[in-house]
């Protein structure tokens, strides 16, 4: 039987077998801007469920991202070398207070994968969460990581030198975030409760905000993309029963 509430989709006849498929979409769990939806379906006595997350930024952070492309709680270094028209600010104090990394734990869909997994499957539209005691290096053997994803870690996240991530990704860390030399991020939101470093020759389209120091090394290209502030919707996955 279907849960109460939610949206019931009109019943469909399945052929062969003349089964009736009943399905509904339900909001199951919500906390700190993260909503979990379940699509439950039954046909011929079988039931299955898919889940999907919608991850929205706290309003305070969204407002900040609308004002600045780069913003730091402590110091901001190197932003003056970027192309004109990029709004940036340093010494803003604790600007990411409304962001709690631990809030993502209950919604975790995947562990941080290995080089070869990134290589083969890309980010796959999932929320990756890690609360371990080691920093995470995001790398693929070919240096290409396709697909959208949200990477959240208690410790630092390092994007390896030369890595190309063309699709929408959100990177959130309680530690530091480092974008390696000559790395290319096609559409990225970087949020660190500590420091962010964009190494020389890297190219980023998006927005970067941190509570600590933000360092932009030489020959970096940083282009504003305000669309990274929109809610991130994960791909449908089979629900873990």
Identify the meaning behind each predicted range.
Residues 1-5:
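Membrane-proximal N-terminal amphipathic helix
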Residues 13-146, 151, 155-165, 169-228:
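Short, ordered "entry" segments at domain starts
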Residues 228-241:
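Short, low-complexity, Pro/Ser/Thr/Gly-rich segments in the mature regions of secreted, periplasmic
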């Amino acid at each position: 039987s279907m849960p109460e509430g939610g949206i019931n989709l009109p019943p469909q006849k399945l052929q062969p077998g003349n089964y009736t498929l009943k399905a509904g979409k339900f909001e199951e769990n919500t906390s700190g801007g993260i909503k979990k939806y379940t699509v439950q379906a039954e046909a011929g006595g079988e039931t299955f469920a898919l889940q999907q997350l919608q991850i929205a930024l706290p309003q305070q952070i969204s407002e900040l991202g609308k004002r600045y492309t780069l913003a730091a709680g402590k110091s901001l270094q190197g932003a003056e070398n970027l192309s004109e028209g990029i709004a940036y600010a340093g010494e803003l104090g604790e600007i990411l207070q409304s962001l709690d990394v631990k809030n993502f734990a209950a919604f975790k869909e995947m562990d941080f994968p290995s080089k070869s997994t990134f290589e083969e499957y890309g980010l796959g539209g999932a929320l990756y969460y890690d609360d371990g005691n080691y920093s995470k290096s995001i790398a693929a053997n070919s240096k290409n990581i396709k697909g959208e994803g949200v990477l959240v870690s208690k410790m630092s996240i390092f994007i390896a030198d030369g890595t190309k991530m063309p699709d929408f990704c959100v990177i959130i860390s309680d530690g530091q975030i480092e974008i390696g030399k000559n790395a290319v991020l096609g559409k990225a939101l970087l949020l660190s409760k500590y420091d962010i470093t964009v190494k020389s020759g890297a190219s980023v389209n998006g927005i970067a905000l941190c509570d600590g120091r933000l360092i932009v090394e030489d020959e970096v290209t940083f282009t504003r993309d305000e669309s990274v502030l929109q809610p991130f919707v994960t791909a449908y996955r089979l629900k873990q029963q």
